[in-house]
Amino acid sequence: MSKLNKSIVAEFESAQITRELPKFSQGDTVVVNVKVKEGARERVQAYEGVVIATKNGGLNSSFTVRKISHGYGVERVFQTHSAIIDSVEVKRRGKVRAGKLYYLRGLEGKAARIKEDLAAAAAAKAARLAEKA
């Protein structure tokens, strides 16, 4: 791809990216509020789980959230800049060392828990308080 084409694609992508989501990474517990259309009406549905993977690719970036529902593991892949995402809230910062947490698929119960990163949580709280003041 030539430099001209790359610059045109980059300009188009920057125009399409309309909002900023909060910073989160693998191991964080997030609540994704998803717009669900049922017939003529639209409502917002919360999907809470652990981020097990992120793919950063500009406009094509995505993240995978895993939760346990009625004893079964459920994973959902969200496009980061999708219109169906109403908002994302970080509930808990996880302390993990791996880039992708696919190993959680084979674990259940207490073994599937992730330690909380208290330092990151305190820093995020301080940043929120400074932003409000």
UniProtKB/Swiss-Prot annotation:
Assigned keywords, A-Z: Ribonucleoprotein, Ribosomal protein
UniProt GO molecular function: structural constituent of ribosome
Any GO BP: translation
Keyword Ribosomal protein: yes
GO CC entries: cytosolic large ribosomal subunit
The family this protein is said to belong to: Belongs to the bacterial ribosomal protein bL19 family.
Free-text function comment from the UniProt entry: This protein is located at the 30S-50S ribosomal subunit interface and may play a role in the structure and function of the aminoacyl-tRNA binding site.
Protein known as: Large ribosomal subunit protein bL19
Origin species: Stenotrophomonas maltophilia (strain R551-3)
